[in-house]
Design a protein with these regions (language model features):
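Contiguous transmembrane helix-bundle modules in multi-pass membrane proteins
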Residues: 1-224
């Protein structure tokens, strides 16, 4: 949108992205020899969760890139002009993000290398029940049940409950509430804050997608 509205602003953003991404890849390449091998890991492990998560993200990125560049490629080859809009991205991107968000809530609870599936399921049962109740109750409270907003509410509360569960487990056996909170480092709290932001975003998308109301009305001076 910035490129289309203001080419000079778009150039600035392009340069900024090149600097940020270029430096990130340069730092990664510089530190690559120091990264130790991950070794073997079981199917039910945090490594597997991260691997599946990254696969979905790469596929979603590729789908978005295809939808963005495909019209330009057709135009450059003289094969006609087409427009790829919101319906394509909604149909392709949303299904890929659903498993990512679902696994995002589970991943931090899974042990590295190998985890016990039964123990993991038992931990997530309360979160699943609360999320399912929220997915049913909120649409009915809004006056109409819609399946896709309900799925969004389920995933949002799935993330919220996972965060609460992690904080509760991490603060277990602490002498005071404050000591339980301070036992975690900044990186751990950063992860929780990032997950909370995604949960809030999903909740907002679900609410807008299903229950947004927009009206055009005529107003004159003095109307309130």
């Amino acid at each position: 949108h910035a490129f289309a509205a203001d080419p000079s602003r778009g150039l600035f953003i392009l340069i900024f992205l090149c600097i940020v991404i270029g430096l990130s890849f340069a730092l990664f390449a510089w530190k690559a020899p120091e990264v130790a091998s991950g070794g073997n890991f079981a199917i039910v492990s945090r490594e597997s969760m991260l691997l599946v998560n990254n696969i979905f993200l790469v596929v979603a990125m590729s789908a978005g890139l295809l939808g963005t560049l495909y019209p330009l490629i057709l135009d450059a080859l003289g094969l006609g002009k087409i427009s790829v809009g919101a319906p394509y991205f909604d149909a392709v991107f949303a299904p890929l993000m659903l498993p990512v968000i679902f696994l995002m809530a589970i991943g931090p609870l899974v042990r590295w290398k190998e985890a016990e599936l039964g123990s993991l399921v038992r931990q997530m049962v309360p979160s699943f029940i609360v999320s399912l109740i929220a997915a049913v109750a909120i649409p009915f409270a809004m006056g109409e049940f819609k399946i896709w907003p309900a799925v969004g509410f389920f995933l949002a509360f799935w993330v919220f409950c996972s965060i609460i569960h992690e904080i509760r487990v991490g603060s277990r056996n602490a002498k005071t509430v404050s000591s339980g909170f301070l036992r975690h480092g900044r990186s751990w709290w950063g992860m929780q804050l990032a997950h909370l932001g995604i949960g809030v975003t999903v909740f907002g998308i679900a609410m807008v997608m299903g229950y947004e109301a927009e009206r055009d009305v005529r107003m004159v001076p003095g109307d309130v």
